[in-house]
Amino acid sequence: MVSVSGIRKVQRAEGPATVLAIGTANPPNCVDQSTYADYYFRVTNGEHMTDLKKKFQRICERTQIKNRHMYLTEEILKENPNMCAYKAPSLDAREDMMIREVPRVGKEAATKAIKEWGQPMSKITHLIFCTTSGVALPGVDYELIVLLGLDPSVKRYMMYHQGCFAGGTVLRLAKDLAENNKDARVLIVCSENTAVTFRGPNETDMDSLVGQALFADGAAAIIIGSDPVPEVENPIFEIVSTDQQLVPNSHGAIGGLLREVGLTFYLNKSVPDIISQNINGALSKAFDPLGISDYNSIFWIAHLGGRAILDQVEQKVNLKPEKMKATRDVLSNYGNMSSACVFFIMDLMRKKSLETGLKTTGEGLDWGVLFGFGPGLTIETVVLRSMAI
């Protein structure tokens, strides 16, 4: 008689979950951060708020962002004037945009990842779709299956309103799926759209104004699987371990509420301090079992929540400036795309490692960390092992 343990062994993969392909995409509309304050106050009919506009210009400059991609154009905003007000009923219009655009850009990223992977779509067994933008029944995961033509037997996991830490969350779930289901191939798609949060300025709401200077649109797709087929699948990173922690005494630091006016959010000024004060604990928990205590000896893929967060993490951990180069490059060229950010960084890192002749996908190093920070305050920590190039 076959034992339960024997059945369980057959059902599971032998090796660790591995990143097999990465694809990214953005809406075609690209905005110049240096002129965004002028544009933003003009399209929202706020040019009379001269002092607030000057303050917003300084906020834009401090972000160290050069460009961002956004679905919303001036033409779209003219057709939807309530979205330009500070708080006017506009959820219907926002939802109509997002349930269309979120899966569309997600499809573009997924198509690139599938092309790099080089295997038939019929081999995809699971789909994880993550977005903070738009809610529908059936979800945008269903819409993506239709757009791509995936097999209807694909097992779907739809994750809404996770926020900026979710790049780590989807890897944690994908790791469990890939390692506990033999031959599983998990397609992850994170697609974010600022149509859910765009609104006009108000001098009493600086949190919203900071968000208008920071957030952007983008999608990333990753294919995860264990036991890559030799000479057929090309491993990029192995997912060694994952962890999620709610930071004590951080309630109210980051959050949001979906209302008739769209998604409203709050960003406490203490967020950079909270993250930096807890970063060493997260690193120690992840890397002590590996005997690693020098965090300059690993590569870094950190969610680019903002310049202040990156600066304080660098200072707290005594990181060399170059450790955050990939993260800061993505921040500069794309802005904060919430859950998708870490995969843009991962993609850039492996490409730059190849271009510069380094020996591994992780800037020539063997071990690395992927961090996500977001509502809760929540910290996701993922330990990665790079692959030889």
Swiss-Prot record:
Coiled coil: none annotated. The keyword Nucleotide-binding does not apply. It holds the Pfam family Chal_sti_synt_C. Pathway: Phytoalexin biosynthesis; 3,4',5-trihydroxystilbene biosynthesis; 3,4',5-trihydroxystilbene from trans-4-coumarate: step 2/2. Homodimer. Belongs to the thiolase-like superfamily. Chalcone/stilbene synthases family. This is Stilbene synthase 1. GO terms for molecular function: trihydroxystilbene synthase activity. Induction: By stress. Experimentally, by yeast extract and elicitor from P.megasperma. Its EC number is 2.3.1.95.
